[in-house]
Regions:
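N-terminal secretory signal peptides that target proteins for export/translocation
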Residues: 1-8
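Intrinsic structural disorder/low-complexity segments
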Residues: 6, 14-15, 28, 305
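Glycine-centered signal
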Residues: 7, 21, 25-26
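Bacterial N-terminal signal peptides
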Residues: 10-21
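Noncatalytic, solvent-exposed loop/strand surfaces
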Residues: 25-456
Length: 456
């Protein structure tokens, strides 16, 4: 049993029932309503053709100026795009302003024109984490919103979880903790929805996962454990053969399966040998895949069962490593990117299919953090890491590096680059994962939100 499991058993409890699993059924839709779209898979369920080439003058439908930076992703709900930002403090490393000026924003834009329809600001609860160190790699707007098509839910760290309707009216605000991250990395896990429950991973704030009533913000359950303090990934959902949904989350050394109705731990599994979990797990046909850095390796686990499922449910273990971005599953293969290297492995066996460096860009632009992968620098932050995750649509993989190189790769068993695009020659930081809807890509930087489309 992993390092945190004894504490978990006491704090979360064990719900005992047998569990075989399959994928949550998803229908094709024109919305992209959470981090990495349908169940966090990063894979579009649409059939619309997606663009392959673009530039500042080709297939760029619109460009909107944002009121501040952020590394959260945009989401799309009908004819509206939502994205979060921050302003007033810590906008860059030369900013000497006071924390009391810190504000977070939820921005709503018209998806067809890029016009800002409304901007709701939320003052920060102080003290906040100081801007600096690794915290400056992603900042104060790292959590991607989530929507049920009726309302939009945001997680603003110590300022709590907040619900707005689609016209920008605030419905409720619930505080989830005021803890400061001892590592000074902050928190980044995005909220997700299950039926009427908003699930918030308040890792730094309270070392807890919370289930909130999405209509009122009232706390339904809270599951606390020290292991959550070093978790930055976003959970996924899976179902068992009885039709019961489980939350699955990667934490240091382990995977956890929890009941979303109660927050109780149903199963756990020894996973990667890493004291932190930065990326998110992904799920396909009841198999949970994880790839971590810091020497953690990779793993596939059949979700379900009860208590410790390490001996019974591990499908394979591998030595592949990843740092920040989350993988994607497609057509029996798993794709992921780390330090400008494209990786593809067999999802059934974990065996490597290819590992090749991405083609060189035609530009040497780097964001202001420093050349060649400095803090908030091009080609990734610490150690040259890119923070955005790949997504897939129309049989093509889209991956955006921090300096704005936008790769389009064919999703096949060999590295086949279709294009390397850019939307700007300016110095901007692209730390967010793109979104896609109706064949249109939405990509945000620390300064702008871009809509890339072949449609008029």
């Amino acid at each position: 049993m992993g390092y945190f499991s004894p504490r978990l058993i006491a704090q979360l409890g064990i719900s005992l029932f047998a569990s075989a699993t399959w994928t949550v059924q998803l229908t094709a839709e024109e919305n992209w309503t959470r981090f990495r779209g349908p169940n966090g898979s990063g894979v579009s369920t649409e059939s619309d053709p997606a663009p392959t080439t673009w530039s500042a003058t080709e297939n760029l439908k619109w460009k909107a100026t944002l009121p501040g930076p952020g590394s959260s992703s945009p989401i799309i709900v009908g004819n509206k795009v939502f994205v979060t930002c921050w302003s007033g403090y810590g906008v860059d490393r030369s900013d000497n302003s006071d924390q009391s000026n810190l504000k977070r924003h939820l921005i709503c834009l018209d998806r067809y024109t890029g016009n800002i329809l409304w901007d709701q600001t939320v003052a920060a609860d102080l003290p906040e984490d100081e801007y600096g160190g690794m915290f400056a790699e992603h900042g104060y707007a790292s959590h991607t919103p989530v929507s049920d098509g009726k309302n939009v839910y945001v997680f603003f760290g110590k300022s709590g979880a907040i619900a707005f309707d689609l016209d920008g009216k605030q419905l409720w605000q619930t505080k989830v903790g005021t803890g400061l991250d001892g590592r000074r990395w902050g928190s980044a896990s995005s909220p997700i929805l299950h039926n009427n429950i908003l699930i918030v991973t308040a890792a730094a704030e309270s070392h807890a996962i919370l289930g909130l009533d999405k209509e009122t913000g009232k706390e339904i359950w809270r599951a606390e454990a020290e292991g959550l303090g070093s978790t930055w990934g976003t959970p996924v959902l899976t179902k068992n053969d009885e039709g019961k949904t489980q939350i699955v989350l990667g934490v240091p050394y382990e995977f956890w399966g929890l009941d979303p109705e109660t927050g109780k731990l149903t199963w756990y599994c020894e996973a990667m040998n890493s004291d932190s979990y930065c990326s998110s797990v992904i799920e396909h046909d009841g198999i949970i895949f994880g790839i971590e850095g810091r020497g953690g390796g990779s793993i596939a686990v059949k979700a379900g069962g009860k208590k410790d499922i390490t001996q019974s449910n591990v499908v394979w273990r591998g030595r592949n490593n990843n740092r920040i971005s989350t993988p994607i599953y497609y057509d029996g293969r798993i794709y992921f990117f780390s330090s400008r290297v494209a990786n593809c492995i067999n999802a059934k066996t974990g065996e490597e299919i290819y590992q090749e460096r991405l083609p060189a860009s035609t530009t040497t632009n780097n964001p202001a953090g420093g050349p060649g992968g400095g803090r908030r620098g091009g080609g990734g932050g610490r150690g040259g890491q890119d923070y955005g995750s790949p997504i897939l649509a129309d049989g093509k993989i889209y991956f955006v590096t921090r300096n704005g190189d936008m790769y389009v790769l064919k999703a096949t068993d060999k590295l086949e680059s279709l294009a390397v695009n850019r939307v700007t020659s300016d110095t901007e930081d692209f730390s967010a994962t793109p979104a896609i809807s109706k064949g249109e890509l939405f990509v945000r930087s620390n300064k702008h939100l871009y809509c890339i489309s072949t449609k008029n």
